UniProtKB/Swiss-Prot annotation:
It is an enzyme of class 4 (lyase). SUPFAM superfamilies: Chelatase. Pathway: Porphyrin-containing compound metabolism; protoheme biosynthesis; protoheme from protoporphyrin-IX: step 1/1. It is found in: Mitochondrion inner membrane. This is Ferrochelatase, mitochondrial. Its cofactor is [2Fe-2S] cluster. It comes from Dictyostelium discoideum (Social amoeba). It catalyses: heme b + 2 H(+) = protoporphyrin IX + Fe(2+). The lineage of its organism: Eukaryota, Amoebozoa, Evosea, Eumycetozoa, Dictyostelia.
């Protein structure tokens, strides 16, 4: 529908335009006319598809979420995958529901992704009018809105170009790779390969805006730590006469991975480590007495099952620090918004463990959520990406994991790329 306001005093006549319907204007009256364009839809010039694994927004979504998760061969390799994964999901759903009940009855990840997307699109319209209008879309892997439904919405909106924007700063085949693989496969299944022109933001672990936003949150947490330390009046000398109780250890916590995935060459651990190093290089917080930077460690959370995963576990690190009389600031380094890993695992389970082990003070650095710094970082990422004449993905995008033997994966390709590059 195209609306045009025509305010004029003209002779009564009927006119016709090839792309418009017949319209009649009356004599000597100010007339407002809505003219239907039946041949053209208003276009969304740039769609921003925000990719994430998702999370159940309501308790009744928990079991379907777990079923999609445990039947995904890119995440878990199970015998008789569909049957076994469905059975595991059914058995775990009640326990997982209780975790979501404790954080408000569902994951806030959709809420935060919507908020980030709205702010991002609005900012993009201002800083990049030539690629406007921009509209964000959400494509979750295991919960609504699923990618298949979002593609239908984009088709209905007449989107021209889409940036597939991973909400995981560090690339892993189990997160970004799985989402992209599902995206390209779904396009093929729906015979929509030629509907949109695509490009990909597949990793951004070293982006300055992301690093700066993380540093900002750590500094805020450090100030909170010192304030709470004064309130608690904690003695700053431990049992070994080490003057270190008032110096927190920075515990960077990221979602873990099975070692079987890591040993295939998944780049996630090295990219998380790169983020940590860049944050520490720019943090600038130093001990007032020694002038040295704060001590830090990278740990891993959310292990599932009995098989080996990345270590040390975040819970193990907290236990050991507590035994040594140390305190900690925990920093979620691979998440851009709050969800069950921050609100339940860190804020509830890890805090309980810290108290049980005798740790006097554990503070969590806030998630990025809708902080203006992370929105600006995302806008800079997308804007730079759109302005590039050559780059439609990262330099590392086409490099498959050395141990990957699955020739059916699409995760290192791009369906109908925006530019005619050799893929």
């Amino acid at each position: 529908m195209i609306s045009r306001k025509i305010i004029s005093t003209i002779n009564s006549k009927t006119f016709y335009n090839k792309s418009l319907s017949y319209c009649t204007v009356n004599n000597n009256k100010n007339t407002t006319i809505n003219i239907n364009n039946n041949n053209e839809k208003p276009k969304i010039k740039t769609g921003i598809l925000m990719l994430n694994l998702g999370g159940p927004s309501k308790l009744e979504e928990v079991e379907p979420f777990l079923t999609r998760l445990f039947t995904d061969k890119e995440i878990f390799k199970l015998p008789f995958q569909k049957y076994t994964g469905t059975l595991i999901a059914k058995r775990r759903s009640n326990a997982v529901m209780k975790l979501y009940e404790a954080i408000g009855g569902g994951s806030p990840i959709r809420k935060w992704t919507e908020k980030q997307g709205e702010l991002l699109s609005s900012m993009m319209d201002k800083i990049s009018p030539e690629t406007a209008p921009h509209k964000h879309y959400i494509g979750f892997r295991y919960s609504d809105p699923l990618i298949a439904d979002t593609l239908d919405q984009m088709e209905n909106d007449n989107v021209e170009r889409v940036v597939a924007f991973s909400q995981y700063p560090q690339y892993s085949c189990t997160t970004t790779g799985s989402s992209l693989n599902n995206l390209w496969k779904t396009l093929e299944e729906k015979q929509m390969q030629s509907k949109f022109k695509w490009s990909v933001i597949d990793r951004w672990q070293d982006h300055k805006g992301f690093i700066d936003a993380t540093i900002h949150k750590i500094k805020k947490a450090y100030n909170q730590f010192n304030s709470k330390l004064r309130e608690l009046d904690i003695d700053d000398v431990d049992a070994n006469n080490n003057n270190n109780n008032n110096k927190p250890v920075l515990v960077f916590s990221a979602h873990s991975l099975p070692m079987s995935t890591v040993e295939k060459g998944d780049p996630y651990p090295q990219e998380v480590a790169e983020t940590v190093c860049r944050v520490m290089d720019g943090l600038g917080i130093r001990d007032e007495e020694t002038g040295k930077p704060l001590e830090y460690i990278l740990a891993w959370q959310s292990k599932v099952g009995p098989l080996p995963w990345l270590s040390p576990k975040t819970s193990f690190v907290i236990e050991q620090l507590a035994k040594k009389g140390r305190n900690a600031i925990v920093i979620p380094i691979a998440f851009t918004s709050d969800h069950i890993e921050t609100l339940s695992e860190i804020d509830i389970e890890l805090q309980h463990l810290a108290k049980k082990c005798g740790m006097k003070l554990l503070v969590r650095s806030e998630s990025l959520n809708d902080d203006p710094l992370i929105i600006s970082a995302m806008a800079d990422l997308v804007n730079t990406h759109l302005k590039s004449n050559k780059t439609i993905h990262s330099n590392q995008y086409h490099l498959k994991c050395p141990g990957c033997k699955d020739d059916s994966t699409f995760c290192r390709t791009i369906s109908n790329p925006i530019q005619a590059l050799k893929l």
